[in-house]
Amino acid sequence: MAEGDNRSTNLLAAETASLEEQLQGWGEVMLMADKVLRWERAWFPPAIMGVVSLVFLIIYYLDPSVLSGVSCFVMFLCLADYLVPILAPRIFGSNKWTTEQQQRFHEICSNLVKTRRRAVGWWKRLFTLKEEKPKMYFMTMIVSLAAVAWVGQQVHNLLLTYLIVTSLLLLPGLNQHGIILKYIGMAKREINKLLKQKEKKNE
């Protein structure tokens, strides 16, 4: 068991080191984005919502076709991939990195690797469910996809995408400041109260 844990830890460290090397040119930008997403300043949340709202208003105004939208998005990614590693050191000064910044960059890369592992793990579990319990897999997929299709039919595509993107960008800050845990705790307490009241009525 210990040998398996050590192997997993070593593999995680190797994957993290590899990702750090790949993203080295993006280090300064990632550190800045990390600060924004974790709401290190009070005005970061409204700034996130403002920028996202502006981007989606532009998309709504231009109303591009799917092909044009995808092409522009990929073109933007290509430009960013080319320009960011060149411009970031000149703007931020990568030679001025502190030990704390280097450690935070390592933590970000480690979290990205762990997130990727979780996603792969869930994907593998899905296929395991398909092999072991095909009926349950079939029913789960049909119900889930039908629910998603119904939501997509009720809500405008652009509005739904806006809500998803905004929620994902606000999620790290909500988690960092304990807001998610706070409301989960409140929901659990309310559920427990309802269950206790039901038990008293049954008695």
UniProtKB/Swiss-Prot annotation:
Membrane topology classification: Multi-pass membrane protein
Coiled-coil features, chain-numbered ranges: none
Cytoplasmic side: 1-41, 87-133
Any single GO CC term annotated in Swiss-Prot or TrEMBL for this entry: membrane
Gene Ontology MF terms in the entry: identical protein binding
Keywords: Apoptosis, Disease variant, Endoplasmic reticulum, Hereditary spastic paraplegia, Membrane, Neurodegeneration, Transmembrane, Transmembrane helix
Function (record text): Positively regulates SLC1A1/EAAC1-mediated glutamate transport by increasing its affinity for glutamate in a PKC activity-dependent manner. Promotes the catalytic efficiency of SLC1A1/EAAC1 probably by reducing its interaction with ARL6IP5, a negative regulator of SLC1A1/EAAC1-mediated glutamate transport. Plays a role in the formation and stabilization of endoplasmic reticulum tubules. Negatively regulates apoptosis, possibly by modulating the activity of caspase-9 (CASP9). Inhibits cleavage of CASP9-dependent substrates and downstream markers of apoptosis but not CASP9 itself.
Assembly behavior: Homooligomer. Heterodimer with ARL6IP5. Interacts with ARL6. Interacts with TMEM33. Interacts with ATL1.
Disease: Spastic paraplegia 61, autosomal recessive: A complicated form of spastic paraplegia with polysensory and motor neuropathy. Spastic paraplegia is a neurodegenerative disorder characterized by a slow, gradual, progressive weakness and spasticity of the lower limbs. Rate of progression and the severity of symptoms are quite variable. Initial symptoms may include difficulty with balance, weakness and stiffness in the legs, muscle spasms, and dragging the toes when walking.
Protein name: ADP-ribosylation factor-like protein 6-interacting protein 1
Organism: Homo sapiens
Record lineage: Eukaryota, Metazoa, Chordata, Craniata, Vertebrata
